[in-house]
């Protein structure tokens, strides 16, 4: 099963795609899609749409796992909500099955602690995916964490 994890954001959208087979998991691809703060919001959303619309058929996920909106700072939350709307539109158009997870669910699944730090989550991702270095940037690492949590949620990987 191929799972694409998405960490939504207007400035930086992280993605991480893993391939799960029985109890093994391999990274297929990960990275970020960025938009410039100098552009109008509508142009930034259009750019996210275009990039995601291109990325989904390349990665061909069987499931997309998306971080559910979780309130931190209102100014940050608005951009995330706008990016999520674009993501949901693309996923609907591409007929992609969707699983939504909250940040505490992801942290709990990977570290055993719902308030884990970013570095603790990155180390868990590095360990579970047998990566030589910590996955970077943070948004891509978070997306891989979301994909790993989805694989556990679907019963493909035991924690």
From Swiss-Prot:
Its cofactor is Mg(2+). Binds 2 Mg(2+) ion per subunit. Keywords: Cytoplasm, DNA damage, DNA recombination, DNA repair, DNA-binding, Endonuclease, Hydrolase, Magnesium, Metal-binding, Nuclease. One of its GO terms (biological process) is DNA recombination. Its EC number is 3.1.21.10. It is found in: Cytoplasm. One of its GO terms (molecular function) is DNA binding. InterPro entries: RNaseH-like_sf, RNaseH_sf, X-over_junc_endoDNase_Mg_BS, X-over_junc_endoDNase_RuvC. It is an enzyme of class 3 (hydrolase). It catalyses: Endonucleolytic cleavage at a junction such as a reciprocal single-stranded crossover between two homologous DNA duplexes (Holliday junction). It comes from the Bacteria. Mg(2+) 2 binds at residue 67. One of its GO terms (cellular component) is Holliday junction resolvase complex. The active site is at 7, 67, 139. Coiled coil: none annotated. Its main location: cytoplasm. The keyword DNA-binding applies. Mg(2+) 1 binds at residues 7, 139. Belongs to the RuvC family. The RuvA-RuvB-RuvC complex processes Holliday junction (HJ) DNA during genetic recombination and DNA repair. Endonuclease that resolves HJ intermediates. Cleaves cruciform DNA by making single-stranded nicks across the HJ at symmetrical positions within the homologous arms, yielding a 5'-phosphate and a 3'-hydroxyl group; requires a central core of homology in the junction. The consensus cleavage sequence is 5'-(A/T)TT(C/G)-3'. Cleavage occurs on the 3'-side of the TT dinucleotide at the point of strand exchange. Homodimer which binds Holliday junction (HJ) DNA. The HJ becomes 2-fold symmetrical on binding to RuvC with unstacked arms; it has a different conformation from HJ DNA in complex with RuvA. In the full resolvosome a probable DNA-RuvA(4)-RuvB(12)-RuvC(2) complex forms which resolves the HJ. This is Crossover junction endodeoxyribonuclease RuvC. It comes from Thermosynechococcus vestitus (strain NIES-2133 / IAM M-273 / BP-1).
